[in-house]
Design a protein with these regions (language model features):
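N-terminal secretory targeting modules
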Residues: 1-96, 103, 108, 144, ...
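Short, functionally important structural connectors and interaction interfaces within domains
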Residues: 8, 67, 77, 94, ...
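Alpha-helical protein-protein interaction elements
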Residues: 42, 64, 70, 90, ...
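Conserved beta-strand elements of the Class I
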Residues: 96-98, 121
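Short hydrophobic segments within beta-strands
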Residues: 98-99, 191
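Catalytic nucleophile serine of serine hydrolases
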Residues: 101-102, 124
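Alpha-helical cap/lid subdomain in secreted, periplasmic
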Residues: 112-121, 128, 132-276
Length: 276
């Protein structure tokens, strides 16, 4: 492939593909279990393919990059698991947890459990932003026929994982997901973004005020539109608007102690949503 075509491909990928942490590469398609998995709480380094000189790329490298670009929303991630997931049993009130790496790692990270015995389904994908989540919302939420969906999203948009993003863009995507859910009689739980004072894969963005502002919008939107607001932020933020190391070793991804603090808050929000 001529060098200029490779450069074009790489530029497109850098602009729209997830670039780090989130950036944690998620585990293969498997139904959710309570078995501990390797620690995925810390982001990996940026994939070297994204920064390699075009002339150094082998044909297999180029094919790998093309494949990632072809499935930007990562619809393949849960396709097989969804196909094997049975419809909810009569009386079962399924809940889909929908998000990025913070959701994806819940139950995969060592010493964390994903609500054993509960009819909850995890459909988080590490690194995702709200436009990616909106694209896969039908496949990974609506088609699973849940009673409720718990949406935790937006921090990777602020980090710029899939390119430039404005508050209005994030709000529009969250609003669209909520509207799709309501149109299919799915109760909506909108979670606050977790506190963050810096992104380890993109230093210097000073996101704390942006997180607070977006959370204020999420809270207002939930109140005005019959959704339940799940306030993780207030229970986890330190005085700097970030997360203490006990709750998130890298300042973004919860530790087992962080998930232990989040779990009862999620349960209460689900109870509220399903009681309406």
């Amino acid at each position: 492939m001529p060098a200029f075509r490779i450069r074009t491909l790489l530029l497109a990928l850098v602009l729209i593909a997830p670039i780090a942490s989130a950036q944690d590469h998620a585990a293969p398609d498997q139904p959710r279990t309570d078995q501990p998995r390797p620690d995925q709480s810390r982001p990996e380094a940026i994939d070297p393919l994204y920064t390699a000189a075009p002339s150094s790329l082998a044909p297999d490298d180029i094919a790998s990059l093309q494949q990632r670009l072809a499935d930007w929303p990562q619809l393949a991630r849960y396709r097989e698991a969804n196909a094997h997931l049975e419809a909810p049993k009569p009386g079962e009130r399924r809940v889909v947890f929908y998000g990025d790496s913070i959701t994806d790692n819940w139950g995969r990270q060592q010493d964390t459990a994903f609500f054993p015995g509960k009819p909850y389904v995890n459909r988080g994908i590490a690194g995702q932003t709200t436009p990616q989540m909106l694209v896969r919302f039908r496949q990974d939420v609506i088609d699973l026929k849940p009673a409720a969906v718990l949406i935790l999203a937006g921090t990777n948009d602020i980090a710029g994982n899939s390119g430039v993003s404005t508050p209005e863009m994030i709000e529009d995507n969250l609003r669209s997901m909520a509207e799709l859910a309501r149109a299919h009689h799915i109760r909506v739980i909108l979670a606050s973004i977790l506190p963050v004072s810096d992104y380890p894969w993109r230093r210097g963005l000073q996101p704390a005020d942006k997180v607070r502002a977006l959370n204020a919008w999420i809270k207002q939107y939930a109140a005005a539109n019959g959704a339940v607001y799940l306030d993780y932020y207030s229970a986890m933020a330190n005085q700097d608007g970030g997360l203490d190391a006990e709750l998130a070793g890298d300042g973004v991804h919860p530790t087992p102690a962080g998930y232990a603090r989040m779990a009862p808050l999620a349960e209460k929000a689900i109870e509220r949503a399903l009681s309406h």
